[in-house]
């Protein structure tokens, strides 16, 4: 069975500001579950509706450096399953709290999504998932490949 991990900044039905969320919400469901183990990871934004947040399942947490001269930061990993797809959420109150997933502060956005990218890669051994394919969606998600 091949494994795919979609990495995105937003995904329907959890959070949507544009077309990326629609694609990320629809595409993973279309894979034949007999041949593909498809999972999605997005940030755990505080603005995700409570109807979903209340059903997120705690998986694990760890602390991670987000750069030199910076204290290690908390990374929580939550999970939710729907329509045969497993969704993971990267939790960090410093970066993902607010009324919207994005801000107008470019420096903060760069730091936030650099942190997210590193957290995604760091969580993989902890959830025992080694993807064969990692499609990254959007310019600020620049996982090293």
What does each of the following model-derived ranges do?
Residues 1-79:
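N-terminal subdomain of nucleotide-sugar transferases
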Residues 24, 28, 114-121, 141:
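Short, hydrophobic/amphipathic alpha-helical packing segments
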Residues 30-34, 123-126, 142:
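Active-site catalytic microenvironments for nucleophilic, acid-base chemistry
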Residues 44-127:
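A conserved catalytic-core segment of Leloir-type glycosyltransferases
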Residues 132:
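Conserved acidic residues
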Residues 139-145:
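Conserved small/polar residues in nucleotide/adenosyl-binding loops
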């Amino acid at each position: 069975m091949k494994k795919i991990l979609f990495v995105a900044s937003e995904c329907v039905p959890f959070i949507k500001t544009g077309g990326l969320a629609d694609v990320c919400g629809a595409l993973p469901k279309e894979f034949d579950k007999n041949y593909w183990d498809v999972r999605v990871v997005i940030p755990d934004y505080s603005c995700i509706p409570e109807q979903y947040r209340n059903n997120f399942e705690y998986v694990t947490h760890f602390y991670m450096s987000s750069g030199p001269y910076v204290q290690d930061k908390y990374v929580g990993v939550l999970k939710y399953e729907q329509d045969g797809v497993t969704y993971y959420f990267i939790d960090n109150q410093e970066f993902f709290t607010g009324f919207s997933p994005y801000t107008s502060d470019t420096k903060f956005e760069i730091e936030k999504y650099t942190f997210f990218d590193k957290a995604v890669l760091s969580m993989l051994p902890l959830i025992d998932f080694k993807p064969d394919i990692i499609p990254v969606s959007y310019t600020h998600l620049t996982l090293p490949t």
